[in-house]
Amino acid sequence: MKSHEIRQSFLDFFAQKGHTIVRSAPVIPADDPTLLFTNAGMNQFKDVFLDKGSRPYVRAADTQKCIRASGKHNDLEDVGRDTYHHTFFEMLGNWSFGDYYKLEAITWAWELFTVVWKLPKERLYATVYQDDDESFQIWKEQTDINPDHILRFGDKDNFWEMGETGPCGPCSEIHIDLTPDGSGKELVNVGDYRVIELWNLVFIQYNRQSDGHLEPLPKKHVDTGMGFERIVAVMQGKGSNYDSDVFQPLFDKITEITGVRYGASLDAPNDIAMRVIADHARTLTFALSDGAMPSNEGRGYVLRRILRRALRYSRNLGYHQPILHQLVGTLALAMGEVFPELVQRQEAVSAIIKAEEESFIVTLDRGIDLFSELVEKLRASNGKVIAGSDAFRLYDTYGFPFDLTRLMAADEGFEVDGEGFEHCMQEQKNRARSDRREKQRVDDDGAKWQWFSDVRASQFVGYDHLVHSATITGIRQGNGKLLLVLDATPFYAESGGQTGDNGWLENSRYRLHVADTVKDGDAIVHVVSDAFDKVQDSAVQPEDVEIVEQELAVAASVHRTARQDAERNHTATHLMHAALRRILGEHVQQKGSFVSPERLRFDFSHFSKLTDEEIEAVEIAVNTQIREAEPVVKHADVLFDDAVAKGALAFFGDKYADRVRVVEIPGMSVELCGGTHVDNIGRIGLFKIISEASVASGVRRIEAVTGKAAEKLLWQEYRELQQIRQLLKAKGDEAVVEKVAGLMDSKKELEKELAESRAAALVEQLTAALQAAPEVSGCRVLAIEVKNNDGETMRQATMALRDKAPCAVGLLATVEAGKVVLVSFATDEAVRTCSLDAGALIREAAKQVQGGGGGKAEFATAGGKQPENLSKALDAFTAAVRAKLG
């Protein structure tokens, strides 16, 4: 049977047994902060086992996409070196939620294996938990397995637990004996590749309490899992998972790309490399298709490590170009029918992987050079361990994950000091913490809060009111500051990227200007910057304001215009986010935002610079939506799961409460958001992007303005265009572009002529200087400062100067933009007969100006930071020449 037939046969079998066939959950868990990746079929049903959720069915079956490349379940470093480990795999499984139990699970498993798939009964073994007599009897009495093939094991092998506490229970596994003579009984559960587990049937019947005792569950569940790649290899009679038709299309494509054929050898370097590349391409393609992005933290860094590990192995095949992105289409073709997201996201995933590959290849070569130097030094000193500090340098400077360095070291017969590496990592973290603590010390003025109420929390009423009567519950003064907490306030405190409101607080005596509003736990803190004493009719310092208990009542008024401008920008951010996901792809996820009354800034995951056409498309999409003037619907106090089910965007790594606020623009955008927004998107008026740039690898940033700020920007640009048109005496926009292009061409030509003229004049000056220069051992030595010249002119002049004397060596020096520029030359005869080296000589000169450089024997350049020592550099050059010539 082909692999796709085996998969479908499994699903059809359980569909006939009354199971609902459910789609695989994404490999990126949507609502489980304990997981980086989906690593088992049961992950999407975890809430059912924990009695926190339910399904509209009691029987289910699926094929689940899984990744095991981090944490407890981490197969990364074994991939390629054996025949059965994978970072990505499929898990076939069937489940019962309080419905059938051990009898059906065991007998159906046996039926599928021996009746439908016709696996040899004499080669199958069933293991049960040592105390699970019920399962033992079912195997013995309800199946025709050889009773001698029913084996009992203890907690380690046959008792499944979700964690230290929670649902758990005994399990029964089916193993197959692949030894030549069928003598593998003693190899069951010892980790021998000749007798392997095929299917694990877990019977969830207990709840492990914190004190360790087992409490029976009111409902018993069944959770089974079978590795798809493993069962395919067995049914196709292959000795390795990698020899089946699951991997053959990938190996064929790798051969097409590299010219290297897969030989199915366990130890051959080429075959190890091909297994790694094929496996890692699957992991990356599926993860990115489900919305993950490579990055420097969390799940993204695991994916980046996987990609870089595969690229390193591609060098073993003699291939030095991006390779993984070329396998995405092969996977989409082979598996897209079962997993349509591979086809839907193929183009974007390929582009993301290619961009990552190109980025790492630039540093890979430099890192390999450094690694080679380290290895050579160790060999010369008979060392065996690469220092942790060197491994950290490879990580910090060249992006080499530690396990990649360890892999390369093992290939060369060396080890890496892991403890030393971790020490360097910890030092870096400590420095970052120290910086943060220092900032906290600067921000903390040491003043104490005075509270007038036992209730410290503030109620926010600003969604519905911009003016509100409130009572002061807390006050803090000192160092020029006045901070106030109210029992209820219309002021929005900075959070979720939106800046805090400003406005006024007023009581019977004072009018206080609130410059900012921030959160401090559950309290909303109003930062007062200016105060006016109405009794004294004069301004007072905020720290001198005297508020007594009789004057705690205040009228709180938010600056209406500023709030409305911030709301325009915030709602526009939601529209832009949705437009980016439509235009660029669903891999776009918010990575950060800043929303103020003046502008908006949005950071998002994307792998390349946006083209002018893409930026224009985003602007057009947002402004088109604004003109639709749709209402903005705010849903308060929504269950998180209900919000996500209705399409609200929620991303792994973000923290959400059980109940959330949802901001919906019908048909356009649905997001979890606690910020303030316009009531109708038409009130945004106009949206204009002002910049797009990179802020980190795989993260782009867009800045934009809306409403009056956008109008102001457009009028400013229009006025500037009109001024340019008048200066150029141009008619129409095209004429302006043509005239400016013509001016630029003329400028370039004039600059070229000027440079040639200056170079010619400099050559003439230097030729005379060279003829007058002193000779040392028959070689003329020129060391001269050339004022009011740039480095490029000096380089051109130097090349011409080499023909002006048979044996000569020289150093030209100047100061350009406050930096020293040095250019050195040596004629062919000076190099050949006098063994002079311009590169070595210029390095001696550069030391005097705290600089460095180098080049070839005939020509070299250098720079420096100390113009005041220019004469010392010239003297050092001359001295070095004299020392060389004796």
Swiss-Prot record:
The keyword Magnesium does not apply. It catalyses: tRNA(Ala) + L-alanine + ATP = L-alanyl-tRNA(Ala) + AMP + diphosphate. Its EC number is 6.1.1.7. Its cofactor is Zn(2+). InterPro entries: aa-tRNA-synth_II/BPL/LPL, Ala-tRNA-lgiase_IIc, Ala-tRNA-ligase_IIc_anticod-bd, Ala-tRNA-synth_IIc_core, Ala-tRNA-synth_IIc_N, Ala-tRNA_ligase, Ala_tRNA_ligase_euk/bac, DHHA1_dom. Keywords: Aminoacyl-tRNA synthetase, ATP-binding, Cytoplasm, Ligase, Metal-binding, Nucleotide-binding, Protein biosynthesis, RNA-binding, tRNA-binding, Zinc. GO terms for biological process: alanyl-tRNA aminoacylation. It comes from the Bacteria. It is an enzyme of class 6 (ligase). Pfam families: DHHA1, tRNA-synt_2c, tRNA_SAD. Its main location: cytoplasm. Binds 1 zinc ion per subunit. GO terms for cellular component: cytoplasm. Zn(2+) binds at H570, H574, C673, H677. NCBIfam families: alaS. Belongs to the class-II aminoacyl-tRNA synthetase family. Catalyzes the attachment of alanine to tRNA(Ala) in a two-step reaction: alanine is first activated by ATP to form Ala-AMP and then transferred to the acceptor end of tRNA(Ala). Also edits incorrectly charged Ser-tRNA(Ala) and Gly-tRNA(Ala) via its editing domain. Consists of three domains; the N-terminal catalytic domain, the editing domain and the C-terminal C-Ala domain. The editing domain removes incorrectly charged amino acids, while the C-Ala domain, along with tRNA(Ala), serves as a bridge to cooperatively bring together the editing and aminoacylation centers thus stimulating deacylation of misacylated tRNAs. This is Alanine--tRNA ligase. It comes from Chlorobium chlorochromatii (strain CaD3).
